């Protein structure tokens, strides 16, 4: 696929405030300068909502990674950190997986992790992580709101941050889906 027709962007945001963990995603799928779908679901729950994952990048690649992550989570008895590290190792070393163009945020009660195709497993500072074309907008908004708006819940911060990202990123929209880690 040529660069000008590549599948573009999304915004995935995950944050933890007062022991509440929320992952939010917009619903837009773009191809070049065309919106293909505005109601895509980019979040998946695993292990009876105890683990939630969101992806940015190629839809098919993101879904393939979800499947691989689910297998790892079952193999490692719902240990998210170990499962993420094992997936990242496979992603980096496997010829097929190495070609996948996606990033993931995964979270459980104890961890928020960013997984990349380079084999990175990053636990972000400040209990906030974001990926995708609108990720930096959402991350900045969430960090500011968490610092200065103590009366807002995690869900309210996520929604406000995602809406700011959608206002600024042409590859993200206001069709926000949120999931809560239980």
Swiss-Prot record:
One of its GO terms (cellular component) is proteasome core complex. InterPro entries: ATP-dep_Prtase_HsIV_su (IPR022281), Ntn_hydrolases_N (IPR029055), Proteasome_sua/b (IPR001353), Proteasome_suB-type (IPR023333). It is found in: Cytoplasm. One of its GO terms (molecular function) is threonine-type endopeptidase activity. A double ring-shaped homohexamer of HslV is capped on each side by a ring-shaped HslU homohexamer. The assembly of the HslU/HslV complex is dependent on binding of ATP. Belongs to the peptidase T1B family. HslV subfamily. This is ATP-dependent protease subunit HslV.
């Amino acid at each position: 696929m040529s660069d000008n027709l590549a599948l573009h962007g999304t915004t995935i945001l995950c944050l933890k405030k007062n022991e509440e963990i929320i992952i939010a995603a917009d619903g837009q799928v773009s191809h070049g300068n065309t919106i293909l779908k505005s109601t895509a679901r980019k979040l998946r729950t695993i292990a009876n909502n105890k683990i939630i994952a969101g992806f940015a990048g190629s839809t098919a690649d993101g879904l393939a990674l979800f499947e691989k992550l689910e297998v790892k989570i079952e193999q490692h008895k719902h240990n998210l950190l170990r499962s993420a590290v094992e997936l990242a190792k496979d992603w980096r070393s496997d010829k097929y997986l190495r070609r996948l163009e996606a990033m993931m945020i995964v979270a459980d009660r104890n961890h928020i992790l960013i997984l990349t195709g380079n084999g990175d497993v990053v636990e972000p500072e400040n209990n906030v992580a974001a990926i995708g074309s609108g990720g930096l907008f959402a991350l900045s908004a969430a960090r500011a709101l968490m610092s200065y708006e103590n009366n807002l819940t995690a869900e309210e911060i996520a929604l406000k941050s995602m809406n700011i990202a959608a206002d600024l990123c042409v590859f993200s929209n206001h069709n926000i889906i949120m999931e809560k880690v239980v």
